[in-house]
Swiss-Prot record:
Name of the protein described by the UniProt record: AT-rich interactive domain-containing protein 2
Keyword set includes Nuclease: no
Coiled coil: none
GO MF term set: DNA binding
Protein encoded by which gene: ARID2
Main location: nucleus
Organism: Arabidopsis thaliana (Mouse-ear cress)
Higher taxonomy: Eukaryota, Viridiplantae, Streptophyta, Embryophyta, Tracheophyta
Length: 573
């Protein structure tokens, strides 16, 4: 345990477990990345590097020490190579050889650390094209994040990499990940930090004024949040819910608001699911490790809910630098130089976590919900009785109400006669003006009456009375002429003015008259007067043949009758 100095940066003793595993994991990633960089240069160099009398050089520690001092150029300019050699356990006489080793082996790694473009940016759509080792660089970049900032921090945190019990406080350490967990509201109350203890499965934060058991207070807020969420679901217009402000004003509220806790919980779940899938997708060595896709541990209900949102690539700038450690718990105490607020950043990743620092929901290390066990066997099956009733071929309740044919179909056949089905109409009739408008209308009326007598009330039930030219019987001659003039005046958008010109007519009546009467008359005119120049039913120029339905279609007979086939054009409006 240690103390936190309010005036200057000081050491804090922290009990950290699994640091050796973190260092070993980081070393393995470093060795893999080094092989990739050496292969890109096209040069073959022996590994491990040997210096002096056959002493092996720890390239990993050499790279960390140089990068900790802001890189190769700064170390050379400030003449710090002797300090680096002393840290590695070498004599000062081996400094030139050590510099040569660094240039040959770690020069490519140095460029990758300096150039931010080489660090995989998951917000970029072209990140998948960075190379097959993008997942390795992703994890290695997070592990070296505190050491690869190119000298932006004056003091570095080396407890992660080398297992020290002293953790230096950095002025900007994990500044990008401070949004994960911070208590900035405590600064206004003057709360001071007293001690930090990290264990394998629990994180206990002891503070002086009113926050002795922080985790218990957060747990007490959970039932209240769930009750508020249930109230919103059952009664969304209840005044007790209150007014939720715009997201831009959420910073003015503390974490005690239920609606703010719900929003944070939703975002945490989305980030957790997204980063788990990205870790599986972009990991280049998943074929050699016992890594399973997270969807294997989820039931069907979760997989259905997964379709409601898309995959959101995580931003490396918002993640912590502890992804190299599986099962480790890391603490970073950071204090702003502006002395405005004191931030406590706690990153606790589970041993079986997929990506450290990506799950806000698991930072309290709550127990996993056990999967539902489905027992299989003859002792766990439902007892279903055998079906003893006979099957029914058809059931009238599924067929609806019978309308046609009627029940007394035999009596109907005797009334109508024995007309052959499919006989068709005769080619000629006994009418005086066979083939003209009056003749055609007469035969249509005969068939309509025949159908009406056969169907009975079903004729009106099927609305046959609202089909054909009978629709115009409910229209006057003046209304028909006005409808025709309206279409001629504006044929493209006459429907917009139809309600104004015919305020007493319903739209259903207007549409029925247009398709059953108006278009039929126009087609009749085109077929009989201009049979050689028919384009479509919506032509601009049209006429009419005969009067309205129910009146004499042709007023003269004999030789004075108009022979339609000899007429080229007619504009009889």
């Amino acid at each position: 345990m240690g103390s936190f100095n309010d005036t200057s940066c000081s050491y804090v003793d922290v009990e950290i477990k699994y640091v050796d595993e973190c260092e070993e994991r980081l070393r393995r990633l470093f060795d893999q990345a080094l092989l990739v960089f050496l292969e890109e240069e096209g040069s073959i160099k022996p590994l491990p590097a040997v210096i002096g009398d056959g002493k092996n050089v720890d390239l990993f520690k050499l790279f960390v020490l140089v990068r900790e001092r802001e890189g190769f150029d700064t170390v050379s300019r400030k003449r710090l190579w002797e300090v680096v050699a002393e840290k590695l356990g070498f004599d000062c006489s081996l400094v030139p050889s050590l510099i040569l080793i660094y240039l040959k082996y770690l020069n490519r790694m140095e460029k990758w650390a300096v150039e931010e473009s080489r660090i995989v940016n998951w917000d970029n759509k072209d990140s998948e094209k960075k190379g097959c080792y993008s997942g390795m660089l992703h994890e290695l970049g997070n592990g070296f994040k505190s050491l690869l900032d190119n000298g932006k921090c004056q003091k570095r945190n080396r407890a992660v990499a080398f297992g020290c019990n002293h953790m230096e406080e950095s002025c900007s350490e994990f500044d990008r990940s401070r949004k994960r967990f911070r208590e900035s509201d405590d600064d206004d109350k003057g709360v001071g930090l007293s001690s930090v203890v990290i264990r394998e499965e629990t994180v206990v934060c002891a503070v002086e004024e009113g926050l002795s058991d922080f985790s218990l207070e957060k747990r007490d807020d959970l039932p209240g949040m769930l009750k508020w969420l249930a109230l919103v679901a059952t009664s969304p217009h209840d005044p007790a819910i209150g007014v939720i402000p715009h997201s831009s004003k959420w910073k003015q509220y503390n974490g005690n608001k239920c609606w703010l806790q719900v929003a944070r919980a939703k975002n945490s779940l989305l980030v957790q699911r997204d980063n788990a899938e990205l870790r599986y997708r972009y990991h280049p060595f998943r074929g050699h490790q016992n890594i399973h896709h997270p969807s294997m541990y989820e039931d069907d209900r979760k997989s259905i809910g997964r379709l409601r949102y898309s995959i959101r690539p995580p931003n490396l700038s918002k993640h912590c630098s502890s992804s190299c450690c599986n099962g480790s718990s890391l603490v970073s105490l950071s204090k702003s130089r502006s002395t405005k607020c004191r931030k406590l950043t706690i990153i606790a990743s589970e041993r079986a976590g997929l990506t450290a620092g990506t799950s806000r929901a698991r930072k309290r290390n709550k127990a996993e919900i056990p999967r539902r066990c489905i027992k299989v066997g003859h002792q766990h099956q439902a007892q279903v009785d055998e079906w003893t009733e006979s099957g029914v071929d058809s059931d009238s309740k599924w067929l609806g109400t019978r309308i046609w044919p009627p029940e007394n179909s035999e009596a109907l056949d005797q009334t109508l006669g024995n007309d052959l089905v499919g006989k068709g109409r005769p080619d000629s009739c006994s009418c005086e003006l066979s083939g003209f408008v009056e003749c055609t209308r007469l035969h249509i009326a005969e068939k309509r009456m025949e159908l009406k007598r056969e169907l009975g009330d079903d004729f009106f039930h099927w609305r046959f009375n609202q089909m054909g030219e009978e629709v115009c019987l409910r229209w006057t001659e003046e209304e028909e002429k006005r409808f025709k003039d309206m279409i001629i005046a504006d044929p493209q958008s006459f429907w917009t003015n139809a309600a104004k010109n015919f305020p007493k007519k319903k739209r259903e009546e207007l549409v029925s008259y247009y398709f059953n009467v108006f278009l039929i008359n126009r087609r009749r005119y085109q077929n009989r007067v201009t049979p050689k120049s028919i384009d479509s039913d919506d032509e601009g120029a049209f006429g009419s043949v005969g009067g309205s339905f129910g009146r004499d279609a042709v007023t003269s007979s004999g030789s004075d009758v108009m022979i339609c086939a000899q007429n080229r054009q007619c504009e009889d409006y």
